[in-house]
Curated annotation (Swiss-Prot):
GO biological-process terms attached to the record: biotin biosynthetic process
Family: Belongs to the radical SAM superfamily. Biotin synthase family.
Annotated catalysed reactions: (4R,5S)-dethiobiotin + (sulfur carrier)-SH + 2 reduced [2Fe-2S]-[ferredoxin] + 2 S-adenosyl-L-methionine = (sulfur carrier)-H + biotin + 2 5'-deoxyadenosine + 2 L-methionine + 2 oxidized [2Fe-2S]-[ferredoxin]
PROSITE patterns linked to this entry: RADICAL_SAM
NCBIfam families on file: bioB (TIGR00433)
Enzyme Commission number, as recorded: 2.8.1.6
4Fe-4S as UniProt keyword: yes
Subunit structure: Homodimer.
Entry keywords, A to Z: 2Fe-2S, 4Fe-4S, Biotin biosynthesis, Iron, Iron-sulfur, Metal-binding, S-adenosyl-L-methionine, Transferase
GO MF: 2 iron, 2 sulfur cluster binding; 4 iron, 4 sulfur cluster binding; biotin synthase activity; iron ion binding
Name of the protein this chain belongs to: Biotin synthase
Length: 350
C-alpha cells in the first residue's frame, strides 16, 4: 500500500462502511507493514498552565467562557515541571508533553518554555508542547530549544468547525501546523469524535489530516469527554464500534503515523481498547488525567499491556536502565501496594 495525500470524503466513507471485521483486518495488515507489531509508545502530559483560556472551544472545561470545576493556575515553575518529567520517565513514559491553556504563548513566557524543553531533554525524554497558536518565529525558538513534537489539533472537519469554535479559524490551525513543519518539528494533530458531527464530518477530518503535505507523525483520536458546565455536556455517546472503525480508517489513511488513543479512554473497557490496538493504535497517554479529565491510571495500563503481550517503547535505552519487559513486570507486581495516585500528572486530548 502506498502513502497517499489525495484522499476524498467519498473514499473514506466507503472505508468506514466496510464490514467491521474486514476493516479491522485491513488496518492490522497495514499496521504490520508500516509499524512495529505489539508495541505501544507511551506519553505523559502535564498541564503547565491550567484554566482561564480565552478560546470558546465547546468541549473544553478550561475555557473562561464556561463555568466548570477547573481552577485557574499560573504557569508552573520550571523545576516543578522537571520533577514531574522525572517521575514520568520512572513510570515508563518515553515522551513528556506539556500543555498550556492559552490562545497563544506570550513572549514573556518563551524563556520559561525553552528552559522546560531543554530540561526535559536532558532527562532523556522526547518533548512535546501544546500552547495554542504559534508564530513562525516562536516555532523556530521552540525547535531551537530541542522540541520534538508540537500538538495542534484540527478537532473536526472544516464544515463543522464553526459549530464548536469561533475564537480561532480553521486556517489559523493550518497555519500553526505549517509553522511547526517549517521549523523542522514533528506534528501531533488529530481530532475529537462525539461533538455532534456527522459521518461526513468525521471523514472530512481525516481527509484534512491525510492530505497535508506530510502526514502528522502522531494522530491523536479523542473520544469526547463530557464535562459538566461545557456546552457539550449532554452530547450523545459515541458508539464503540464506530470509534474503533475510525481508528482503523486513520491507520489505513496514514500508515506511517502513530495513531494515539487519547481522551475518552477512561470510559473504554479493556476489550474496546484491545480492539483499538488491533485496529492500529500504537500510542497512548498514560497516567491519572488527560489535562483536566480522567484517564486510566498507569498500573491499569501496564496490566492491560501485559495481558495483550504489548511492550511500551523506550526512546533511549541506556545500559543501566530497566528493560521494557522488566518494567512491565515491576509495575504489575506493585499494584496492590501502590500509594495514592499523584495528581501532578495530567493527560489531555492532544
Amino acid at each position: 500500500m502506498e502513502v497517499r495525500h489525495n484522499w476524498t470524503v467519498v473514499e473514506v466513507k466507503a472505508l468506514m462502511d466496510k464490514p467491521f471485521m474486514d476493516l479491522v483486518f485491513e488496518a492490522q495488515l497495514v499496521h504490520r507493514q508500516y509499524q512495529e507489531a505489539n508495541y505501544v509508545q507511551v506519553s505523559t502530559l502535564l498541564s503547565i498552565k491550567t484554566g482561564a483560556c480565552p478560546e470558546d472551544c465547546k468541549y473544553c472545561p478550561q475555557s473562561a467562557h464556561y463555568r466548570t470545576d477547573v481552577d485557574r493556575e499560573r504557569l508552573m515553575e520550571v523545576e516543578s515541571v522537571l520533577d514531574a518529567a522525572k517521575k514520568a520517565k520512572d513510570s515508563g513514559s518515553t515522551r513528556f508533553c506539556m500543555g498550556a491553556a492559552w490562545k497563544n504563548p506570550k513572549e514573556r513566557d518563551m524563556p520559561y518554555l525553552l528552559d522546560m524543553i531543554k530540561g526535559v531533554k536532558d532527562i532523556g525524554l522526547e518533548t512535546c508542547m501544546t500552547l495554542g497558536m504559534i508564530t513562525s518565529d516562536q516555532a523556530g525558538e521552540l525547535s531551537g530549544a530541542g522540541l520534538d513534537y508540537y500538538n495542534h489539533n484540527l478537532d473536526t472537519s472544516p464544515e463543522f468547525y464553526g459549530n464548536i469554535i469561533t475564537t480561532r479559524t480553521y486556517q489559523d490551525r493550518l497555519d500553526t501546523l505549517s509553522h511547526v513543519r517549517d521549523a523542522g518539528m514533528k506534528i501531533c494533530s488529530g481530532g475529537i469524535i462525539g461533538m455532534g458531527e456527522s459521518v461526513n464530518d468525521r471523514a472530512g477530518l481525516f481527509v484534512e489530516l491525510a492530505n497535508l503535505p506530510q502526514h502528522p507523525e502522531s494522530v491523536p483520536v479523542n473520544m469526547l469527554v463530557k464535562v459538566k458546565g461545557t456546552p457539550l455536556e449532554d452530547a450523545e455517546d459515541v458508539d464503540p464500534f464506530d470509534f474503533i472503525r475510525l481508528i482503523a480508517v486513520a491507520r489505513i489513511m496514514m500508515p506511517e503515523s502513530a495513531v494515539r488513543l487519547s481522551a475518552g479512554r477512561e470510559s473504554m473497557n479493556e476489550q474496546m481498547q484491545a480492539l483499538c490496538f488491533m485496529a492500529g493504535t500504537n500510542s497512548v497517554f498514560y497516567g491519572c488525567k488527560l489535562l483536566t479529565t480522567p484517564n486510566p491510571d498507569e498500573d491499569s495500563d501496564m496490566q492491560l499491556f501485559k495481558k495483550l503481550g504489548v511492550n511500551s517503547h523506550q526512546v533511549a535505552q541506556k545500559p543501566d536502565e530497566v528493560q521494557e519487559h522488566e518494567l512491565l513486570d515491576r509495575v504489575a507486581e506493585r499494584v496492590a501496594s501502590r500509594p495514592d495516585k499523584n495528581d501532578l500528572f495530567y493527560e489531555a486530548s492532544v
